[in-house]
Each structure stands twice: as C-alpha cells, then as structure tokens.
Amino acid sequence: MKVRYAFQKLENLPEGFEVPAGRVKTWGTAHAILSCKDMIDGPFAVINADDYYGREAFKQIYDYLSVHEDNEKYQYAMVGYQLKNTLTENGSVARGVCDIDSNGKLVSVTEHTTIVKRGDNAAYTEDDGKSYTDLAGDTIVSMNLWGFSKGFLSEIAYGFRDFLQEGLQHNPLKCEYYLPSVVSRLLDSNKAEVKVLLTTEKWYGVTYREDKPMVMTALKKLEENNFYPKQLCGKLEAAANFCFEGVYKEEIPWGMDILMILTVLHLKMNKE
C-alpha cells in the first residue's frame, strides 16, 4: 500500500477569506478531508487516525464502495457499531447514536457527550449526572468510519464558504467544520443516502490512560490468533517514530495533533 500525507493548513481557504489573527486551531474534520482532494480520484473511506476498527469493518466498507455508484442521490455508507462494543470501564465517552430507517439507511446521528457503561448496557446524562437515560447495549453508534464517493469533496467545498461566513462572525478562533455536519446537510436536503453497515466488531481506542493496557492486550491476542502478522511493516519502530517533516525521531510526535484530523484511505477500484 502506498502511503501519502496530506497536510491540513490554516491558510487553505476559499478566495476572499483570510486566517483570523490569533487563530492556531485547524478548521475541523471536513476541512481535513478537503486537504486531501488532490490525492483522491475515486471512492474513499475515512477513519479516525488513532482508533482500531476491526478487519471486518474495512471489508464491509470496501465491498460497498466497490459496487455502489451515485444515482439521483449520493450513495454513501457508514459502519455502525454496537454501543456495548465501544465503551470503557474507565469513564464516560461521547458517541453519536444513530437513527436508522427500515431500509437500513441513516436518518440522523444524535451526539451524546457523556455516556457511561452499565453492565452490558449504558446510560447518558445531559445534566452533569443529576439524571440518566438508559441506552441498550446493542444501540447502533457511529465511530466515524465513513465511505464516500468522490462527489463528497465538492459538497465539502460548497459548504465551507457558508461555514466560514457564519463561524468567523461568532467564533473566529475556534469554530470547526465537522464532517458529520456535511452529511447531515445532505440528508436534510434529500441529496444523499447513507447505508448503515452493521458490524459486531469490537472497537478499540485509548480514551483514558487506563485504557491502554486493555487495548494492548486485545491487539496482542489478535496477533497471537493470526489475525495480523507480528510485524506489519519492514521497520515498525522507524515507522512509528517517523515525524511528518520526514526526519526519524526517538519519540512519536503526538504533539502534532497526530492529524487528529482524519486519516483518509483512498480505495482504488479495479473495474476491469
């Protein structure tokens, strides 16, 4: 697999806009994808750079993008995880709870910022813990594994101007252009359909420092069960410590926001 890096630059703005004085924060996840537009010439998938999604989930998104094309509407996909497979014992998490219609299409995503684990189920609070609402463990949530056609890039660019005109007035130093907001706009305007691809995969991420040992153990078991080779690349240590300036470093450069933006995996389809 060929790996290329796209850099999210503050000054990458439409004509007529300038970076506000004092702004250091990047423009958000939708803008991160826009930063990759010159590298994408077909369907593509988007993931969080520092999460583990499971092999089955990648196959699902690849299979979908291989056979689906836009028609009168954009045809997108999202892998939906069972809430119980995304929780931690070490504190609360934020999750996007999915509303799905009878045809398996996404209707909306409702963000809950404080969800806690309760056995095999969960509950969320919106009043700092004064009250909780139960959530079933098999509730479907979005973990930001999306599949898009190339046309999504045009829609991001189209909405970016409107975002800037409003955001720069109200919160010029911190406003962010989020990927889900673009999807929501297209769903609300009936321009897109998003197929929810259900998975029973376990999602792993280090939300809290205390999560790290559990995640390391889980990934080790996958290796021992031959899900993955023991060494994923020729020089694993060098790959892990390769900083974006192209210089080998002794420490992993987490301070760079690690493209906290999103990693974009471009899926080139062989249609011969």
PLM region spans:
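Catalytic beta-strand/loop signature of glycosyltransferases that borders the donor
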Residues: I140, K195-E201
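A C-terminal functional module that forms or caps the active site or interfaces directly
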Residues: A157-R161, Q165-K191
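Conserved N-terminal catalytic core of the sugar/cofactor nucleotidyltransferase
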Residues: M1-N48, Y53-Q60, S66-V67, K249
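Conserved core of the sugar-phosphate nucleotidyltransferase
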Residues: R55-L145, K150
